[in-house]
UniProtKB/Swiss-Prot annotation:
Source species of the chain: Saccharolobus solfataricus (strain ATCC 35092 / DSM 1617 / JCM 11322 / P2) (Sulfolobus solfataricus)
Description of how the protein assembles with itself and partners: Part of the CMR ribonucleoprotein complex, consisting of crRNA plus Cmr1/Cmr2/Cmr3/Cmr4/Cmr5/Cmr6 at 1:1 and possibly 3 Cmr7 dimers. A Cmr2/Cmr3/Cmr7 subcomplex without crRNA can also be isolated. It does not cleave target RNA.
Coiled coil: none
Keyword Cytoplasm: yes
Protein name: CRISPR system CMR subunit Cmr1
Xref: Pfam families: RAMPs (PF03787)
Length: 467
């Protein structure tokens, strides 16, 4: 029998929830926030927290698949039904429904038909959508939409990451020799829709997350410990993570509006949530958050699981061809600042823009801290994530030398470009009782060397400069 275990009323700040295609919405589903995304992220943060506790208590790390096997009673697996089901109820007005109508394209088509092949560019200036043909002819486009572009355009234009992504939606080459008028119209309409849709970014999305527990399933030993550990990892995910794209750059950060507990199994987590405001007043938030991550209570749950079901776990080792992430006690929360949100939320948008513009080797903060370019690029490659490389030789030898010497274990240098890597240095916008904070923290990884005092100092100074 399925019963409601716990409910969270959550708020996401500037979530980019369109998925793989970089849109604000996805053609395959209408929901702005999906239970499957939440559950996938929850499972990932559960792996992070389990390895965090394991590294503190045993100095060991475990593979993600073996951690999933240990927690399959909670999250389910290919052959086992999940004991928990998530339900997401989005508040009215928080959806990303996009409408576009009455698009006037006749003048553009007439201009295009006079030529064989033309490149068409879109731009939005002075609240007017303009089509520019091969850099000469500029035609204003009349249209109707439910989207207030003026409300969000400054965030998109001033944010280096967003403005770069927008380039992929603003131009197309049309061969008018093989395209009749209706085909051209359809191509142009798709171009305009994709371009305008990129501006469909909500300042905030509020939703209720209901967690249901199926009590009819025959749970194996230590189920309560597993569930309580998993609920703790959900709390860490909410406090330090987010939904959608670019969460490491501050977008989509989650905050708790309120919480309800309907079963004794969630009593401890409910107590932590309720006490956060009073704890924040007694202690600095930079103390409260690590206390939650490195809680003695979850260490007890960890010990119970290790003592009884360690046979399910497989140790991660230096021969592995993948990385795992975890927190370390030496360096985790780097910097927390209160955000001034007095003027139309500009404080939050300014922070988001600054984070995106600074988190690269060409950012002013890193230039001020690390004068030598190759050393600076090595630092960025080690801590700020990277795209996938075709091979390691795409990296300059001098950068590799600094990576070997300071940041990355030599045996993993050949693997750091194998897949796209997460940024270890992450930023999160968190709201507590109508006060907004920007948090910078370090999520460590198995490919990184133990940080010396100089590297720690650079990380702290860099976070201080950015926020």
């Amino acid at each position: 029998m399925e019963e409601l275990l716990m409910s969270f009323k959550l708020k996401a700040i500037y979530p980019l929830t369109g998925g793989y295609n970089r849109h604000s919405i996805n053609e395959f589903y209408e929901e702005n926030v999906r239970p499957t995304e939440i559950k996938g992220l929850w499972r990932w943060w559960n792996r992070v927290l389990f390895n965090t506790v394991s590294y503190v208590k045993e100095g060991k790390l475990y593979t993600y698949d073996s951690i999933d096997r240990l927690f399959e009673d909670v999250f389910g697996s290919e052959n086992k039904k999940s004991a928990v089901r998530l339900e997401v109820i989005t508040d009215e007005g928080s959806d990303n429904h996009f409408e576009l109508s009455n698009v006037e394209l006749d003048n553009v088509i007439d201009c295009l038909k006079a030529n064989r092949e033309e490149k068409v560019n879109l731009d939005f200036r002075d609240n007017t959508l303009i089509i520019e043909i091969e850099g000469s002819t500029k035609i204003p486009i009349s249209f109707k939409s439910n989207l207030d572009i003026d409300k969000i355009k400054d965030l998109v234009y001033k944010n280096k990451l967003l403005s770069f992504e927008l380039l992929g939606f603003k131009s197309i080459k049309i061969d008018t020799k093989i395209s009749d008028k209706e085909v051209i119209k359809e191509i142009l309409r798709d171009l305009i829709t994709n371009y305008l849709e990129y501006f469909n970014i909500k300042q905030e999305v509020t939703f209720t997350l209901n967690i249901y527990l199926d009590k009819s399933l025959k749970h194996k030993q230590n189920f309560d410990a597993k569930l309580k550990f998993a609920l703790h990892s959900l709390l860490v995910f909410i406090l330090l993570g987010g939904i959608g794209r670019k969460t490491s750059r501050g977008f989509g950060g989650l905050s708790i509006v309120n919480a309800e507990c309907h079963d004794g199994l969630c009593g401890e987590i409910y107590g932590i949530v309720n006490n956060m405001e009073s704890e924040k007043e007694k202690k600095d938030l930079a103390t409260v958050l690590p206390n939650i991550i490195f809680s003695q209570t979850i260490e007890q749950y960890f010990s119970e699981l290790i003592n009884n079901e360690s046979y399910k776990l497989r140790s991660w080792n230096n021969n592995s061809d993948f990385f795992v992430y975890y927190f370390i006690k030496d360096i985790n929360i780097l910097r927390i600042n209160r955000i001034d949100t007095n003027v139309n939320r500009n404080g939050i948008e300014n922070i988001l823009n600054r984070i995106s513009n600074e988190l690269s080797a060409s950012g002013n903060c890193l230039k001020d801290l690390i004068m030598q370019e190759m050393r600076r690029r090595a630092f960025a490659l080690a801590f700020l994530g990277n795209r996938k490389f075709r091979n390691i030789h795409e990296i300059y030898p001098r950068i590799l030398e600094f990576l070997y010497a300071n940041y990355i274990k030599r045996e993993f240098v050949n693997l750091i470009g194998k897949e796209r890597r997460l940024s270890n240095l992450r930023f999160k916008i968190l709201e507590i009782n109508n006060t907004y904070y920007i948090i910078s923290y370090l999520l460590y990884s198995s490919y990184l060397k133990d940080p010396n005092s100089s590297i720690k100092d650079t990380l702290y100074q860099f976070a201080r400069c950015v926020i």
